[in-house]
Amino acid sequence: MLANYAFIGVFFIGAIIFPIIPLAAAYFLGPKRPTPIKLDTYECGLEAIGDIRVQFKIQYYLYALAFVIFDIEVVFLYPWAVAYGQLGLFAFIAMAIFLIILIGGLVYEWKKGALEWV
C-alpha cells in the first residue's frame, strides 16, 4: 500500500528540489557587487523619469478577484459535468448549493456596485 504512494512522495520531493537548485546556483555563483547603476530601474533602453510605481484603481483588483473566483468555479464545475451521469442526486444537490452560493455572491457584488466602472 505504501509503495503506491512512493511515486507521489518522490514527485513531491522533486517538485521542491527542482526550483531550489537553480536559485541556489544563481545565489552562490552570481556576482555580488551591486552598484547604483546596477540597482537603477532599466526599461527598453530608456532611463526612468519620475515615479516608477503606478497605483492602480481598486476596481482592477475587484474585477481580478471576481474573475479568479468564477474561474475556480469552472474548475470545480467541469469535472462534475463530465461525470454527472455516475454521480447521482447527492452530487447534483452539492453542486446546486455551490452555484447558489456563488450566484448569491455575484448578486451581492452587483447590488453593492462593485461591478460598476467609474
Curated annotation (Swiss-Prot):
Swiss-Prot/TrEMBL catalytic activity: a quinone + NADH + 5 H(+)(in) = a quinol + NAD(+) + 4 H(+)(out)
Its EC number(s): 7.1.1.-
InterPro entries: NAD(P)H_OxRDtase_bac/plastid (IPR023043), NADH_UbQ/plastoQ_OxRdtase_su3 (IPR000440), NDAH_ubi_oxred_su3_sf (IPR038430)
Subcellular localization, as worded in the UniProt entry: Cell membrane
The keyword Ribonucleoprotein is annotated on this UniProt entry: no
Top class in the EC scheme: translocase
Organism domain of life: Bacteria
Transmembrane segments: 6-26, 62-82, 87-107
Keywords annotated in UniProt: Cell membrane, Membrane, NAD, Quinone, Translocase, Transmembrane, Transmembrane helix, Transport, Ubiquinone
GO molecular function list: NADH dehydrogenase (ubiquinone) activity; NADH:ubiquinone reductase (non-electrogenic) activity; quinone binding
Entry GO terms, CC: NADH dehydrogenase complex; plasma membrane
Membrane topology: Multi-pass membrane protein
Keyword Membrane: yes
Subunit structure: NDH-1 is composed of 14 different subunits. Subunits NuoA, H, J, K, L, M, N constitute the membrane sector of the complex.
HAMAP family per the UniProt record, alphabetical: NDH1_NuoA (MF_01394)
Role this protein plays: NDH-1 shuttles electrons from NADH, via FMN and iron-sulfur (Fe-S) centers, to quinones in the respiratory chain. The immediate electron acceptor for the enzyme in this species is believed to be ubiquinone. Couples the redox reaction to proton translocation (for every two electrons transferred, four hydrogen ions are translocated across the cytoplasmic membrane), and thus conserves the redox energy in a proton gradient.
Family note: Belongs to the complex I subunit 3 family.
Protein name listed in UniProt: NADH-quinone oxidoreductase subunit A
